From Swiss-Prot:
Matches recorded under Gene3D superfamilies: Ribosomal protein L28/L24 (2.30.170.40)
Gene Ontology molecular function: structural constituent of ribosome
Entry annotated with the keyword RNA-binding: no
Key word Metal-binding present: no
Family of the protein in this entry: Belongs to the bacterial ribosomal protein bL28 family.
Protein name as catalogued: Large ribosomal subunit protein bL28
Polar residues: bias regions: 10-26
Region (Disordered): 1-28
Length: 62
């Protein structure tokens, strides 16, 4: 299973590192995902959730 937020869909994105000489190298920017037990259809399930979604208070932990 890929590391993608179950609720918000946040996932790894790509960008560039830039040096002082403006040379570029590829880099990845990863979201802060935590594995959390939540109720889905009345059953507890472990899913990856972004901390932004957790802080919003819309997610009920089990």
């Amino acid at each position: 299973m890929a590391k993608v937020c179950y609720f918000t869909g946040r996932k790894t994105s790509s960008g560039n590192n830039r040096s002082h000489a403006m040379n570029s190298t590829k880099r990845t920017v990863k979201p802060n995902l935590q594995k959390v037990r939540v109720l889905i259809d009345g059953k507890p399930k472990k899913v990856w959730v972004s901390t932004r979604a957790l802080k919003s208070g819309k997610i009920e932990r089990v």
